Amino acid sequence: MLIHAQGVDSESFFKVMPKLAKKYHVYAVDCYGHGGSLHDASKYNVVDIGNAVIDFIQNEIEKPVSLLGHSSGGLIAAYVASHSNLCRNLILEDPPFFSSQGERRKSTFNFVDLSTVCHEFLTQTETSDFVLYYFSHQYAWNFFPEKSREKIREKMIGMAAKFRQKNPDENLRVPFWPKAALAGFQGMNRYDPRFGEAFYTDSFHAGILHEELLRNIHCRTMFMKAKADVSSDGILLGALGEGDLHQVLEALPDCRLIRFDCGHGIHVEKSKEFIRQVEIFR
């Protein structure tokens, strides 16, 4: 069973699903606030989503599963594993343990990027197109050379706006924009920015400490760790740092750690190695 990251939907796994389906019966769900699932801001927390996943496994699959969660989906998967006996194998794909909770969250890429953009979008009235708003205001513009940044930004936003006008129901495509970055727009058409607001306010975690979640996991576990760095102004450019990873492994002493030389979307950027590791862990 696959649980996607925030901002995208279950289709974000389409690149790896055909090969996984050769050895698994694959289930991929849309979390609340994403895709075709319920859009109700009161449900945008790890408890309500986690319990919905537990209910789905109990009533639809009717037996324990191998559960894989990417990013925030990994936090949800950890909740399921720690609050039920329905998880046989747990695979955590670069989830933001410790870094996304409490005051720490304010110094992470997700906070200065998606969370803050969601918050600002919800407080303005000029546009209702969140996809274009996010593209226009994303933190990634800071990575462009300062001298040419605004010129490039203006041109790219113009191309994105034309695409959105002609193809409002399609996933965003912008010429020259990296494919790995565009993968983050998969399903954003049906993303509720109030979900990002839950990470902005820290309400997503419903008061449950990450260490508490991890220490109550007793099934086989594998952690997939992507690259991370820290910017000159102290922003964690990645899901979690080495200190956070150390805390994860302390709480899960029998966890298998696999490192990937890529960005946050491991199943997108390193799909072959991702599939290989999942099959080895079976």
List each language-model region with its residue ranges:
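Short glycine-enriched nucleophile-adjacent loop
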Residues: 74-85, 90
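Catalytic histidine-centered segment of alpha/beta-hydrolase-like enzymes
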Residues: 259-271
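Active-site loop/oxyanion-hole signature of alpha/beta-hydrolase fold enzymes
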Residues: 31-68, 72, 79, 103-109, ...
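Conserved loop-alpha-helix segment in the C-terminal half of the alpha/beta-hydrolase fold
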Residues: 215-261
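Hydrophobic, aromatic-rich cap/lid helix
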Residues: 150-212, 228
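Conserved HGGG/HGGXW glycine-rich cap/lid loop of the alpha/beta-hydrolase fold
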Residues: 1-39
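Flexible "cap/lid" loop of the alpha/beta hydrolase fold
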Residues: 91-150
